[in-house]
Amino acid sequence: MKAQVLSTLGPVEDGRLTLVDRPVPVPAAGEILVRVAACGVCHTELDEIEGRLAPRLPIVPGHQIVGRVERLGSGATRFQTGDRVGIAWINWACGTCDACRAGAENLCPAARWTGKDVDGGYAEYAVVPEAFAYPIPARFADAEAAPLLCAGVIGYRALRLSNLSDGQTLALYGFGASAHIVIQVVRSRYPRTRIVVFTRSEEHRELARRLGAHWTGSAADAPPGPVHRAIDFTPIGSTIRDALSRLAPGGRLVVNAIRKRDPVPELDYAAHLWHEKEVKSTANVTRQDAEEFLPLAADIPIVPEVRTFRLEDANDALVLLKQGRIQGAPVLTMT
């Protein structure tokens, strides 16, 4: 099979992925082999390749995988050959630690992550424990479904963590793959909420307005009225300070990032945290997040904005993603 392999860390501009031929993996007991149709390209891959979230090496990246079951490992009974499934960031959790027993498998210290600890979806085939695969709603094409598995699921988790009430003002910082899905959830499920979007790109602002943003601007602009909840999707450390400075008393900021590309600047307690302002981070996802979000996405229905690339062009997709030159979500397709 063809696969893009990361062997050394460094800037994505250097074309760190190498296209190779590899044997098709064999599913172990309880696993399924998936013929990959599409795999989303995520900011987490930038963090892995550039060393901010160092993966096992060599590794096949990619954790937003859509494909069809090709083969069942012994004892695997949840799916049938030919079923369409998705594979997300969480690949396995122990099920016995304090976090897992509390329903927080995303915090399991022994968890394995797709495309970081085990080979992912920048390849023609991938294997996964059947308990960590998900049925894909029929209404989505393969490339549309791929970003739902991370950008959508982690965005859904961030929105839940924001504790948004209908009618409050929600600020979204950055408007890429995750934010463009979250805004559609908010417009559907929180119809009285006012949405303001901060992004540097005029093309991204235009997309935000098309999807229902009430106001758009850059980090230097001031939106009308107070901001009660905010979600930071950016890789920029200073966005945390900017967002906290705009929060109303009692407001909450959710930082939807595994790593920041640059440091968070020093905060001033009175300006940024006083008046019971809160900061929460998102940390990975659970199976429950995906199992709740995918049917919700079909019901709304979410319309993912995607730009497709061939598997051979994965390095180009990563560079464009880093440069902020992709509207919506980049997706690799295998055909």
Task: Describe every region a protein language model picked out.
Residues 42, 90-134:
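Cysteine-cluster motifs in flexible loop/terminal segments that predominantly coordinate metals
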Residues 237-303, 334-335:
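Glycine-rich phosphate-binding loop and adjacent beta-alpha segment
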Residues 3, 287-335:
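C-terminal hydrophobic helical "lid"/dimerization subdomain
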Residues 25-39, 49-98, 132, 137-139:
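Glycine-rich beta-strand-centered segment in the early N-terminal region that forms part
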